[in-house]
Amino acid sequence: MDAFRLAPCGPLRGRLRVPGDKSVTHRGLMLLALAEGEGRLFYPLKAGDTLSTARVLQALGAEVREEGPHFLVRGRGLRFKEPEDVLDCGNAGTLMRLLLGLLAGQEGLFAVLTGDASLRRRPMGRVVAPLRAMGARVDGREEGERAPLAVRGAPLRGLRYTLPVPSAQVKSALLLAGLFAEGVTEVEEPTPTRDHTERLFRHFGLPLEVEGRRVRTWRTGPFPAKDLVVPGDFSSAAFFLVAALVTPGSEVVVEGVGLNPTRTGLLTVLKAMGADLEWRVLEGEAGEPVGWVRARHSLLKGVAVDPGLIPLMVDEVPVLAAAAAWAEGETYIPGLSELRVKESDRVRAIAENLRALGVEVEEGPDWLRIRGGGVRPGRVRPFHDHRIAMAFAVVGLPVGVEVEEPHWAEISYPGFFQDLLRLCAAS
């Protein structure tokens, strides 16, 4: 489909459940593939990125089978088989970076990792360099900075490493490698990042110590598979919450959504902007808090965002920009250097699309300044990025918008546009 046209939408009304959390699905599949025996991943995300993870793990000898909405995984007991072909990670940066950690200590195993054009442009040196310091043998384009990447499993030694910039993916890759290393592997973060890997280590009984911003692990022995329930993805829920906030008369409740505090920085910022939001944690699944969030239309005001919150909402910056476009006054969002190297250059993509909708925006090397007050109808480009496609469907919803190449939303949210239209129709 060339473009998806959303007519101006009246109030959004209703309740919904969003697909399973992408981060938890990736990590859950990987750990089940490492485990001994059989385990189920209930209500995972089944979309472009996570299906790439399933295919890669199958190529490494794990049995991954779909059972209705679930995955059944029979693990390899810490030892993967050497793949017969190149491992294609598609568009999934999380998969490629975590896989480097997973394979680095598989002694004697050889694998080549590649991905689509977008993934082959993304920086991998931030993972490769500390893995090499552990003894990993990894090579690739630009001295290992870009895929394709070749990995030859080797004996690893523990490492004490301080992340130069906050990155849950680098932290997770090193923790996974640490399961195969001699001695302790310790990662220190400059600021907290999402902690799904740590929670899943506890779920599976893997070695883990957390002390402030330091996380430690060490070599593990075989461990049994355990079933895992995946919560709804807060990053997917965020689009509907902001859609309700900016569309007059709206009230939307997202149920069964993950409310991990290392993921919900957006709620803090939206509340500071004057958003009418309520949420409650009802239960926990595999150490992950789960609950509901209600959003009602609100008259938002611009704010200066605390840069310390950005690692807790790094995937929600595009939809925060959508809220800022409708807010009264100026919103300043700093600390965005990581967004330059996501699926797209998200800082540039946000700025260009906001301008296309008549919003005044300034773009710096690692910041955005958005002068809100509303948008005009227009046509927006996803830049091959799922979160840009969905965020700009939301920002244009009250006035009407055309989204080019809407299929990019399928990377993380199959059925996104159908769910959006259903809530519009419910009013």
Swiss-Prot record:
Keywords: Amino-acid biosynthesis, Aromatic amino acid biosynthesis, Cytoplasm, Transferase
Principal cellular location given in the protein's record: cytoplasm
Enzyme Commission number: 2.5.1.19
BP term (GO), one: aromatic amino acid family biosynthetic process
Gene Ontology MF terms: 3-phosphoshikimate 1-carboxyvinyltransferase activity
Annotated localization: Cytoplasm
Residue sites binding 3-phosphoshikimate per the record: 22-23, 27, 167, 169, 315, 342
Stored Gene3D superfamilies: Enolpyruvate transferase domain (3.65.10.10)
Catalysed conversion reaction: 3-phosphoshikimate + phosphoenolpyruvate = 5-O-(1-carboxyvinyl)-3-phosphoshikimate + phosphate
Pathway of action: Metabolic intermediate biosynthesis; chorismate biosynthesis; chorismate from D-erythrose 4-phosphate and phosphoenolpyruvate: step 6/7
Gene Ontology cellular component annotations, sorted alphabetically: cytoplasm
Record function comment: Catalyzes the transfer of the enolpyruvyl moiety of phosphoenolpyruvate (PEP) to the 5-hydroxyl of shikimate-3-phosphate (S3P) to produce enolpyruvyl shikimate-3-phosphate and inorganic phosphate.
Subunit field text: Monomer.
Protein name: 3-phosphoshikimate 1-carboxyvinyltransferase
Organism: Thermus thermophilus (strain ATCC BAA-163 / DSM 7039 / HB27)
